[in-house]
Every structure is written in C-alpha cells, then in structure tokens.
Design a protein with these regions (language model features):
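Sec/Tat signal peptide C-region and signal peptidase I cleavage site
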Residues: 23-27
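Transmembrane beta-barrel domains of Gram-negative outer membranes and organellar outer membranes
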Residues: 28-271
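Generic N-terminal leader/processing signal
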Residues: 9, 22, 115-117
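Bacterial N-terminal signal peptides
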Residues: 12-22
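Bacterial N-terminal signal peptides that target proteins for export
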Residues: 2-13
Length: 271
C-alpha cells in the first residue's frame, strides 16, 4: 500500500513539474480556455474543436459520517476534454484512490467515466447559457472497492448567467444513478463565481442530492435521510493562457464536523 502511494505521488509530482516547466515557453500564447475544475457543479463552456484539456489533481478526504472513520487520498484524478465539434466535447475521467480505515487499507480505480457536454444555448444575456452533460459510469469487477457493480448514468442540464463583469451565477440540475441503488439521485447545485482580475477567480457553491429512498449513509448513525447537503469553496489562478492551478475545500451539512475534503489541481490545454 505504501509503495502504491509513493508511486502515485511520484507520478503526480512528475506530471506537475512537466506542466510548470512549460509555462515560460507558453508565456506568449494568446489562446485561452475555460477549465471545468474545480467545483462539484459544472460550467457550460465547451472545448474548441480539436483542442484537448487535461485537468488533474490530488485530494484528501476525511469521512466520519454515519459512524464511518475513513481517510481517502486521491493520488490522481484526470479529466480529459476533447472538442469534437463546435457544439460538443467528449469527456473521459479516471481517478485513483487509497483509503485507510480502522479495519484496513485498500485502493484502486475510484472513478471511470466517459461522457459528453453539448452546447444548447449560448447568448447568455437575457436568458442563461445552457448546456447538456451526459455521463456513463463504467462498472468494476467483483473485487472493485469504489466502482459501481453495474453500469450507471448521469444526465445534467447546466445553466450560467453573467451577473456583471466580475460575477457569474451557474446552476446545475441533474439525475445520477450508479446502477446499485433502487432509484437515482436528483442533483441540485448553484455556483457563484467572483473574478476580480484576469488571473484570479473565487467561487462558493452548494450542491445537494435527493433520493426518494432514505439513505442511511447520508445521516447520523442509526438514522437516514432523503437529502445530502454539501458545500464547496475554492479558487483558481491563471498561470498562463494554457495553464491554471486551483484548490478547493468542501464540507457536509448533514454532519458538519464529520466530513471535509481538500484538493489541489492543475488544468492544462495540451494543444
């Protein structure tokens, strides 16, 4: 387990150094793009046709909700976005994690998805910009610790209003089903972004899930709930037109003192 952790850290560090080392050569670039990371909600912007974005990072999550006592380290999360047409992009994501519990340690692929984001409406002045995002969750085998046992799906409608030159309001409505539960979760999220300058941006968001069946892992021990209330805050800094760095921190309002998640990330326009 330690060797697996060290290997993941070494890989993430090498990739980060590679990206940071290329900043000087990219300083004169005028190309710009809009990363999706960070944040649990997703923006409406689509990658330009033929362009590839790589969004990667690490994270550490403490989870003691519902009597659990787990620490999960994301040693690498990678999202690749390819502009397929002027109206659509293809999205591939894979995450690797290690979890420590009092009963023992385990690790492996924590998330594997393929999906698309499609531009629906882009004027965004009187009416909000709109995009559709569809995702397929790839299942794991019988020995998988994180992946669902069955094929899962997510479908989201994404909206964005420009409130002013510095403030943007985004909201995200969707349904998510991992293939293992009786009914899908309804996802409702809202994101307020403040961009005081060309390089800096800050955001705060609320993202929540509702399930028609009460979930025992969404509440205190011995209790269950229809709702899972979460919140996240973070910032991003544009190092160059092709490279962004970001960080985030999120909490659970169901058991405020028993959950926290912090992460660092990089978004890089590869071509």
């Amino acid at each position: 387990m330690i060797a697996y952790l060290i290997s993941g850290l070494r890989r993430t560090l090498c990739l980060s150094l590679l990206m940071l080392g290329s900043v000087r050569s990219m300083a004169q670039e005028t190309i710009d793009f809009s990363p999706d990371a960070p944040g649990a909600t997703t923006g409406v912007d689509i990658m330009k046709q033929g362009k590839i974005d790589w969004e990667t990072g690490i994270g550490l999550k403490w989870d003691r909700r519902n009597g659990e006592h787990a620490r999960t380290f994301t040693i690498n999360t990678s999202m690749f976005r390819l502009g397929l047409t002027p109206q659509a992009e293809v999205r591939l994501q894979i995450d690797e994690c290690i979890t420590h519990t009092p009963e023992g340690n385990f690790g492996g692929i924590a998330n594997a998805t393929i999906g698309t984001k499609i531009k629906v409406y882009e004027d965004g002045k009187v009416f909000p910009k709109v995009a559709f995002m569809g995702t397929m969750l790839i299942p794991g085998g019988s020995n998988a610790h994180y992946l669902p046992k069955h094929l899962g799906f997510q479908a989201h409608l994404l909206f964005e209003n420009e409130l002013s030159s510095k403030f943007t309001l985004g909201y995200d409505l969707g349904a998510e089903w991992n293939g293992d539960t009786e009914s899908p979760d309804l996802f409702i999220g809202a994101n307020l972004t403040y961009q005081p300058s060309e390089r800096w941006s800050f955001f705060v968001e609320s993202y929540n899930r509702y399930n028609s069946k009460r979930q025992d892992d969404w509440d205190k021990p011995g209790q269950d709930s229809h709702f899972n209330f979460m919140s996240e805050a973070g910032l991003a800094y544009k190092v160059s037109p092709r490279l962004y760095v970001n960080t985030f921190y999120d909490i659970s309002f169901n058991e405020f003192s028993r959950y926290s998640n912090i992460g660092l990330g990089v978004a890089w326009l590869l071509n």
